[in-house]
Amino acid sequence: MGLPKLVCVFLFAACCCCRRAAGVPGEEKQPVPTPDLVEAEVGSTALLKCGPSRASGNFSQVDWFLIHKERQILIFRVHQGKGQREPGEYEHRLSLQDSVATLALSHVTPHDERMFLCKSKRPRLQDHYVELQVFKAPEEPTIQANVVGIHVDRQELREVATCVGRNGYPIPQVLWYKNSLPLQEEENRVHIQSSQIVESSGLYTLKSVLSARLVKEDKDAQFYCELSYRLPSGNHMKESKEVTVPVFYPAEKVWVEVEPVGLLKEGDHVTIRCLTDGNPQPHFTINKKDPSTGEMEEESTDENGLLSLEPAEKHHSGLYQCQSLDLETTITLSSDPLELLVNYVSDVQVNPTAPEVQEGESLTLTCEAESNQDLEFEWLRDKTGQLLGKGPVLQLNNVRREAGGRYLCMASVPRVPGLNRTQLVSVGIFGSPWMALKERKVWVQENAVLNLSCEASGHPQPTISWNVNGSATEWNPDPQTVVSTLNVLVTPELLETGAECTASNSLGSNTTTIVLKLVTLTTLIPDSSQTTGLSTLTVSPHTRANSTSTEKKLPQPESKGVVIVAVIVCTLVLAVLGAALYFFYKKGKLPCGRSGKQEITLPPTRKSEFVVEVKSDKLPEEMALLQGSNGDKRAPGDQGEKYIDLRH
């Protein structure tokens, strides 16, 4: 080959190399087209289309690739309209939808957020890229406040709270709020530090720590965090619960607090405590002014720093003061003195202390008491509670025996409800013993054990004796009254003689006779309310009008068993009589039902053996008292017994 030809070949080769190196317009590499964006939530199915939604063409012959590190990895083939999975991580999650142009990816995970390529074997169809974006809502955020507390005097930022949002994708955004207002980064005031952790599932766990310098006004501040995230459906957010953080600050003021609030009285349970406007509460001491020296002396308190007055008394009144010591700042504060007033009523005194008076004379009773408040006095009868008068003096004129007994003087403070004191005084009216009845009957059964009671009143206090043997017990309802109960066996001798109780004192005596009546089958007692038993009888002084003594009635002997026996016997007698009449009628000895009439002559009517005693336990309003030494006078209520005869 000649030299010219070699030169031409060399130049041609050089030109080709230069053209290849420099590039030729029209032969540049085609850029990657903008991919279609497909969004799906974790766990759902993503639909990947091989071309725009309105694109037309034959997609019966396509290949699907995964773009990974600029490499194309075949994952699925479509041949003649049928899908064929390729081995790999997507082998069991890919399938064709209704259209061969749509590839379905099931059970989407965060790892599926990649670029996919669809290549058609038809020359007219271009390569189509699909970008899959995956989303997952985080769980409800949790927040943990600083439980140790933050002191306002600290200059450095202290951790306020920590917010955690788990299992979200992509990483959510966190916002902090105080009292519903968003917090922003502020130098030397607010700092927010967030970090993320990638779980094995590909999801993110976000942790955000809020640090700040707090002030006293933040003691009740509400802090919470908010997570903002996006889903295919749009933007969303989740809020944590609100928390408060203990804020410590020194006290500026201390004061005394007393419970209960209001007027106090002796006997109340009173609690004295110290309080400040600081947090935490400092150490307290409670001092009380000594009235004799004028100095403040420390009082003994419990482990909580409380001074308990249980019960409150008069000497607890006085000036109290609190002192606080802040161990953090070593500052001592004192409260204003508080005057504690315990209202009281002193012991009540009645003069004379043991009054005695003759019947018909007058008596003056005086009541005295002391209090720091205005007093009111009231006089009452102890037994009945009857109000006799108001004022410190009670005047009794032309007294009778019924005026004897106990009187109550009550001194009260109207301004302080429940504050009062009382004193009893026993008034003695000289006189011989008196009783309600001269004679009383009681129905008994032979060989039964009977309790007989006898009551008498007088001044001096009488004594009671019995004319029969038995076990007697006594008790005194009041200084002028005595009640004696005799336990005795009912014998024929006792039925014949009865029982007598005699009350006597230095001024005379009085006697009540108890007549015992034996209950038999022929004795009926029609009204059990009049004679109510077989075991007990009470004989007591009768109460006059306006009297202050009360008659004590004990149960009387019962006769229900006897009445039942009598009814049964009568029923049996009637049954036998009816049977006899029926027998004679059947034998034809009775003219009943025949034409002949015969007169039946009855025997003469005889008096019934049944006697019913009608008794009354109620005595007249006014009854003459039985006078012992002045002669025996029958009580108006004892007018003899009334009988109703039952005849055939």
UniProtKB/Swiss-Prot annotation:
GO terms for cellular component: external side of plasma membrane; extracellular space; plasma membrane. Glycans are attached at N58, N510. The keyword Oxidoreductase does not apply. SUPFAM superfamilies: Immunoglobulin. Residues 281-304, 532-554, 625-648 are annotated as: Disordered. Residues 631-648 have a biased composition (Basic and acidic residues). Residues 24-563 are extracellular. One of its GO terms (biological process) is vascular wound healing. Plays a role in cell adhesion, and in cohesion of the endothelial monolayer at intercellular junctions in vascular tissue. Its expression may allow melanoma cells to interact with cellular elements of the vascular system, thereby enhancing hematogeneous tumor spread. Could be an adhesion molecule active in neural crest cells during embryonic development. Acts as a surface receptor that triggers tyrosine phosphorylation of FYN and PTK2/FAK1, and a transient increase in the intracellular calcium concentration. This is Cell surface glycoprotein MUC18. It comes from Mus musculus. The lineage of its organism: Eukaryota, Metazoa, Chordata, Craniata, Vertebrata. The gene is Mcam.
